[in-house]
Amino acid sequence: CGQRDAVGEAGGAEVGGGPRTLFFPGSSIGNFTPEEALVFLREAHAACQGGALLIGVDLVKPVGILEAAYDDPLGVTAAFNRNLLLHINRLAGTDFAVRDWSHLAVFDAALSRIEMHLQARRDLTVRWAGGERAFAAGERIHTENSCKWTLPDFEALLTQAGVASGVSW
């Protein structure tokens, strides 16, 4: 396998003359609520009329698998989640102490989504210029959602958005 210059090999071919394919990788659509996903799909479909959508979707799995994926043994996701507090401190001048918060990932079956939370490990107060907020031990801050889909539910969403469902794998 040698290196190739794919752009150079295209020889200045005109881009945009044919049908468009929109690629939305990973399972990023899961970061939208179902209502937001519907709007996105409608807009994406309109943007590539005559073309195609290639979308990564995370499907519903057993709860243990989903929760383990969002609470990995190495603590990568927990560190990512707690890092929000450092950014809030920097941007808003708060005094969140990262060590005072535990990462929690739970699957809400009724909403078909993983919810990530930060949970206060003890009673504490967070301060900022002109204010403060007390948190009781165990109180949570809901930081992120990741919606999961069954194939029939996602196909129904596509239909609702006016998108013809194609191949799934």
What does each model-found stretch correspond to?
Residues 18-27:
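Short SAM/SAH-binding signature in class I
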